[in-house]
Amino acid sequence: GVTVEVPSVKYRIDCLRNLPASIRFLSCEPLVEDLGELDLTNIDWVIVGGEHAINARPMKEEWVLSIKEQAEKQGALFFFKQWGSIGRDGVYRSVERNGSELQRKTYKAMPAVNRHTLFG
């Protein structure tokens, strides 16, 4: 997998796509900017989460929804990890209190993993 938290590192997706791997995934965490359009061809799984730190930057709900919609349209599984230290309402609180619901639902899709996937 590769981390893609800002648009300037989207080139990492192409690098990942060209590597031999059983499961290819993006970790969009901490998501600190709108990533815009994503080419998720041959990407199996997309994980999204907010930043958790004292000086955390907020993550906007529309950024998360855009990634979710693109993943669904392109056949990648979507996993929303958590809002981070700043909730969707802009309030700073613990990661646990901000939770992991997106539009009142949880998204915890994961690819199937078996011994063959892990060890070939």
Task: Give the ranges of each region predicted by the language model.
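Core AdoMet radical
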Residues: G1-D34, I43-M59
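Auxiliary Fe-S-binding modules of radical SAM enzymes
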Residues: V32, E37-G120
